[in-house]
Amino acid sequence: MNNAAKRADCWFGAKNYGRAVYECLRGGLYFTKDDENVNSQPFMRWRDRFLFCAEAVYKAQAETGGIKGHYLNATAGTCEEMIKRAVFARELGVPIVMHDYLNRGIHRKY
């Protein structure tokens, strides 16, 4: 296995989610991805998630010497908001964002 998706609906919170990304990448995976339903939820806001995940990727790369990545879910309710999120990811130096076009704008609660 060389990639993994973590389930965010277990109420991780952004900091712990970033830690899970780091542990996966540090443990040998090449990339991870956000769950399709992760947009911006009360327990994990998108900006915080982006920051902690970017930090995790860079830390894992520095420690392993390998190329690592994480697919950040930039899905939002409007095109303008998605572009805002993608631009923020680019400013963090994150080369990969994903957009769930079938779920766009739908914020599921379990």
Swiss-Prot record:
**Localization per record:** Mitochondrion
**UniProt keyword list:** Mitochondrion
What name goes with this protein? Putative uncharacterized mitochondrial protein AtMg00280
Mind giving the lineage of the organism this protein is from? Eukaryota, Viridiplantae, Streptophyta, Embryophyta, Tracheophyta
Return the similarity comment. Belongs to the RuBisCO large chain family.
List, alphabetically, the InterPro entries matched: RuBisCO (IPR033966), RuBisCO_lsu_C (IPR000685), RuBisCO_lsu_C_sf (IPR036376)
PANTHER family for this protein: RIBULOSE BISPHOSPHATE CARBOXYLASE (PTHR42704), RIBULOSE BISPHOSPHATE CARBOXYLASE LARGE CHAIN (PTHR42704:SF16)
**Domain of life the protein comes from:** Eukaryota
GO MF annotation list: magnesium ion binding; ribulose-bisphosphate carboxylase activity
Give the organism, scientific name: Arabidopsis thaliana (Mouse-ear cress)
Anything else the record notes? Seems to correspond to a fragment of a former RuBisCO gene.
Q: Name one Pfam family in it.
A: RuBisCO_large
Gene3D superfamilies, sorted: Ribulose bisphosphate carboxylase, large subunit, C-terminal domain
Q: Name one GO cellular component term.
A: mitochondrion
